[in-house]
Amino acid sequence: MRSVSYVQRVALDFSGSLFPHAICLGDVDNDALNELVVGDTSGKLSVYKNDDSRPWLTCMCQGMLTCVGVGDVCNKGKNLVVAVSAEGWLHLFDLTPTKALDASGHHETLGEEQRPVFKQHIPANTKVMLISDIDGDGCYELVVGYTDRVVRAFRWEELAEGPEHLAGQLVSLKKWMLEGQVDSLSVTPGPLGVPELVVSQPGCAYAVLLCTWNKDTGSPPASEEATGDSRETPAARDVVLHQTSGRIHNKNVSTHLIGNIRQGHNPEGGNAGLFALCTLDGTLKLMQEADKLLWSVQVDHQLFALEKLDVTGNGLEEVVACAWDGQTYIIDHNRTVVRFQVDENIRAFCAGQYACKEGRNSPCLVYVTFNQKIYVYWEVQLERMESTNLLKLLEAEPEYHRLLQELRVDPEDLPAVCTLLHQTLYHPDQPLQCTPSSFQDPT
């Protein structure tokens, strides 16, 4: 395991307290460049743009914000910001700029706060949220996990046609009851390529939640209130629990999950997607399909957040896990591990694409600390994940062998090659002393 150091960092001002899932990266203003969204326990929603330490804009919500997200939740072809409070208030914000900006790029609101374009009450005690197509119909659904081991799915339903104004509501599609606490929600392709909704379960386990409403005789009526539980009948058969292989020391340990890990062009992988799990006691696993364990890694840190990020630019997403003390692990599909240390304790973490500088998105690691700062490490890239040395790199260069022949050095004579490289790097002004006998003139 090798250590890396990232130095390109910006510090953002943040003075509030937040829940672990009240932070995300996404394109909030539909300009193809991602922003950072953070919600705090006072109900304040802050959006950071580029490398400015101050929020680009702020919004006020009702209640303590527990989870935020960015996506086309209304299926109108435009991203909205979704903020949900512990009290069950769901807010939708359309942050596409319509007002003039000042010289620094901040909104000239003159004290006017950004207000939600839609607000609805859903069941309280929210914990985690997901915006994704979970049933394969091409439309996005909103999935919310709760502290009482319940997961609910919602879908936006229009009440009137109107592209400029949101005239509709979120209707409840289904309610699932889990055996353990839900710490993560994700979607990953199943064996047939159809999306599967997966949730984490304690003890490095996970459950697949079946979306059966498409098989029913009809869709939920628009008049059905999302807050009502009278017509929600959670069925045990719609929850398929999976215990991952291997020995688990603590069956109740908190577990996090991330799905749909991009594996590039891999004909051998078929349609099945990759997903990863991590636990608070330091276990990391990469899975393919339901019960195919690709690798398992044990570290000596408490892992509380799990993300995916392509740090090598080869189309394969690495698994990124963060511990409370700032230790961050980056692991590729071949179980190669790289670690990065942030010298502060961390209260929340996320990773993804963020337009920090140069007017383009780049891989970023985002850490929320306890000292009123958010650190964004941008341009997080590695040339390769695996460890290597100078000789291995030179061996891949055709020019290397030609130059050795000109210098009359045998490429197979490792001591002579090392001596030549040492002298070239550290004593270039001295004459070359390396002339192996195999290349000497016998006369």
Swiss-Prot record:
Gene symbol of the encoding locus: Itfg2
This chain's protein is named KICSTOR complex protein ITFG2
* Organism, scientific name: Mus musculus
| Residues in FG-GAP repeats | 19-48, 125-154
Q: What does this protein do?
A: As part of the KICSTOR complex functions in the amino acid-sensing branch of the TORC1 signaling pathway. Recruits, in an amino acid-independent manner, the GATOR1 complex to the lysosomal membranes and allows its interaction with GATOR2 and the RAG GTPases. Functions upstream of the RAG GTPases and is required to negatively regulate mTORC1 signaling in absence of amino acids. In absence of the KICSTOR complex mTORC1 is constitutively localized to the lysosome and activated. The KICSTOR complex is also probably involved in the regulation of mTORC1 by glucose.
UniProt-annotated location(s): Lysosome membrane
| SUPFAM superfamilies, per database record | Integrin alpha N-terminal domain
Keywords, alphabetical: Lysosome, Membrane, Phosphoprotein, Repeat
Gene Ontology cellular component annotations, sorted alphabetically: cytosol; Golgi apparatus; KICSTOR complex; lysosomal membrane; nucleoplasm
